[in-house]
Curated annotation (Swiss-Prot):
This protein's name: Exodeoxyribonuclease 7 small subunit
Keywords assigned: Cytoplasm, Exonuclease, Hydrolase, Nuclease
Annotated GO biological process: DNA catabolic process
Gene3D superfamilies named among the record's database cross-references: Exonuclease VII, small subunit
Record carries keyword Oxidoreductase: no
Superkingdom field: Bacteria
Subunit and interaction comment: Heterooligomer composed of large and small subunits.
Amino acid sequence: MSKDQQSFEEMMQELENIVQKLDNETVSLEESLELYQRGMKLSATCDATLKDAEKKVNQLIKDEAEDEENGKEVNE
């Protein structure tokens, strides 16, 4: 799977690995900058994925509430 096609869980794992590497004092400045940039990209992608999931859950809850309301109206 390419980096652009990683699952949310894979991206989070890579992000955790990046944080661990950045905590390592032996990482060069150049590598630190590359890791930081990759981490920021992963963070933004994970954030967008979570927001999209939240929207879907909220829509499902709204749809369920509307279905229940419509069901009550039909039964009344």
